[in-house]
Amino acid sequence: MQSFLQEVAADLYRRYGEDVSSLHILFPTRRARHFFIDALSHLAERPMWQPRWLTIDDLMQEVSGLHSGERIRLIAELYKVYSACHDEPFDKFYFWGEMLLNDFDTIDKYRVDADALFRNIYELKELESDVSYLTAEQLEVIRQFWANFTDGATLSEEKRRFLAVWRTLGDVYHGFRARLQRQGIAYGGMMQRAAAERLLAGDFAFAERRRYVVAGFNALSACEKVLFRFLQHNAETDFYWDYDDYYLKNTDQEAGMFVRENHASFPPVVELSHDNFRKEKELTVVSTPSNAVQCKYAGRILDALRTGADGRKRPLDKETAVVLTDENLLLPLLHALPEEAGGINVTMGYPIKTTLAYAFLERLVELQAHRREGREGTSFYHVDAAGILAHPYVARSAPQTIEQLRRTMLADRRIRMTADELGQTPLLKTLFTPAAEWRELSDYLLRAVAAVAREPYDGDDARQRVEFLAVISEQLIRLRNSLEACDIEITTSIYTSLLRRHLQTVRIPFEGEPLEGLQVMGILETRNLDFRNVVLLSMNDDNFPGNRVAQASFIPYNLRAAFDLPTPAHHEGVYAYYFYRLVQRAERVYMLYCAHADEKTTGEQSHYIYQLDFETGFRLKRVEVGVDVNLAENPPIEVAKEGDVWEKLSRFVDPESPAMLSPTAFFRYVACPLRFYFYSVARLKADDDLTEEVDAPMFG
């Protein structure tokens, strides 16, 4: 198998030799660079300089002269413009302000006439604004959603306020762009549009002669097409397209939707191999009852791939990839990989939201959210306090003190405990300090994280603990700086919401060599890369391709289609290309899906699997995996009636002994002798739960 990047490297080296180092190369992903350099290193006869690497964003920024702004700051600037037209607090604006920013971004990337689009939206909403048929309950939902309606508003007033939002979208859009332009920052779409307009006006030229290589792109926005035309006519540019004739020449195949246009508009400098779908492939479809079984079975597949023709096991190399269409399966998959698999390169990073450090931060946030101020000072809710005390980062710091606090809480039935009662050590005093305003909460979280990081810790995850806490501390500072740059007052609740949303997207990169061992990656990272063996997980139709076109948008579907904005059909074409491009050079492809249907999934395999089965002529091997119900037997617990045990039992039948069997103990003995032993002989009792209501045992 010769990969796409190997073919590109071979052609460039054949044509330019060591002058390849003078080229400016654009790939869709940064990871493609590593594989390209590896391919080039096998061709070069002596050491040479690398080519110059660029991304589309780098070029757009160079041409436009604008810089990308932090997302939180962009939404804050959008709010300042929006609030001039509508009286709405930032807390309520933020989350649908994100939706508005996404729409503006899409409008600019596709160079849509914003005034015409917003005028159409307003007219469409005016037709839809007759609310006379709505029930009182439905009207109440509308009032709560917009937060603009008052209980005493008339129907016509509701209609007026409803339409006012849509009428001002154009003004907000233009005002927002002008405000950002004055500050020299932009969102992605605005930067692309500014660059495209400058190129079309002839106001930009490169300061020096450049030769570009554009390789492996697929779906292009209108602004990106303008950039590529500029490179085509104003710089020496070589285009390479990664496709197969199977879907390029078949106009009914959605995988070729974009590459057909690209191939015609930007002809390739040379034709590479495009007949890989004619080659023999081993395609296997695996139906599993759960995601956990998917991961386990993927481990078995990888173990089988390690076995060579001579029967010996060998480590897996970069020719094998596990592709996660649902990145939530990363951790279960890592636990299911065979220990002898060799090196593993994970491209997606470790999600911070699954770490103990993030759980600790959540405990702190909940602790402050439920605190109360009273005559005795600040008090904390027992559930939050107990959670902090039980967390591994805290429990090992002063085990005796913490155990005594826990016992006091249970024995005295303390629903709330004061900060003075809980702050028995320097660490606990730091953790149980009140923080009201959002800046105080931010400072408090930073102090708490730093205090925990300084504590001695002898757990197996000591190194990871410090790294995770350092990442959280860094993200807290970044969020604080972004919010202060916005110059907008927010509530503590909106701060905690922003903090959660921010941290849940943070991933910690794994350390490793990208060109060694098994490759574990998401579907987007596979662009331009080819593998001999591919294992695809979560190949359910509602997940892959699914429907990732944002449902929350001000732009309805019919107007998206009319103005050539991305629609579900666009999304379908993009993901069909990802799939078929990944399969085209592979020799073995395993497609696993969960056949279990519930409220979240239909259990249906991806329609791409059906297409392979009925349209390509390949024979698909199908495997159904069940659940192993042969559970390991637990040995029975037996306690011999001898020695000390017999002496304790004899007390209950000795007429001179004060020990007696209560009715409850006798019933327990009849129901389960072992339970009787634990309660009445060994005196083992579970800790009482701290209840907030008077239950039957407490009432008597």
Regions of interest found by a model, annotated:
Residues 393, 566-616:
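C-terminal accessory regions
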Residues 24, 302, 306, 610-700:
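C-terminal, charged and often intrinsically disordered regions of DNA end-processing helicases
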Residues 1-558, 617-622, 688, 692, ...:
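Nucleic acid-machinery interaction/catalytic patches
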Residues 238, 284, 343, 360, ...:
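Generic structural signal for residues positioned in beta-strands
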Residues 552-568, 581:
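Active-site rim segments in enzyme catalytic domains, especially the processed small/beta chain
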Residues 528, 582, 672:
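Hydrophobic, well-ordered secondary-structure elements that form the walls
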Residues 540-543, 597-599, 683-685:
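Short, surface-exposed beta-strand-loop junctions and turns on beta-sheet-rich folds
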